Swiss-Prot record:
Quaternary organization: Part of the 50S ribosomal subunit.
Gene name of the record: rplP
Organism of derivation: Idiomarina loihiensis (strain ATCC BAA-735 / DSM 15497 / L2-TR)
A cellular-component GO term for this protein: cytosolic large ribosomal subunit
Segments of skewed composition (Basic residues): 1-16
Protein name per Swiss-Prot or TrEMBL: Large ribosomal subunit protein uL16
Matches recorded under PANTHER family: 50S/60S RIBOSOMAL PROTEIN L16, LARGE RIBOSOMAL SUBUNIT PROTEIN UL16M
Amino acid sequence: MLQPKRTKFRKVHTGRNRGLAQSGNKVSFGTFGLKATDRGRMTARQIEAGRRAMTRHVKRQGKIWIRVFPDKPITKKPLEVRMGKGKGNVEYWVAQIQPGRVLYEMDGVPEELAREAFRLAARKLPFKTTFVTRTVM
């Protein structure tokens, strides 16, 4: 599963997920993409589940790019532990997703196959997504 090799700080503030995606909002590498239309958090497990669903559907043909990386640690205190005594241990890693962010890209497959693969990947995610194609300018 994806997680940073090393970080400057072990734990981070909760923060707020606001605004629209300023970067990573265009299809850059492939021909087709899966774009978030809602905001939320995408865990490393969800990223991997989506990748597996797409890879299995296209039968390992074409190329898939993962455009998000889980770089935010989420902490959790153990069960039946009283409040206080510091922040809990890092439980898992998430990527914060804003509307407009391209999550996955695909190339080398027909559009119908890509659409179906992205639909299967979108079922694994906790927010709404849409299918996008590369715009040539």
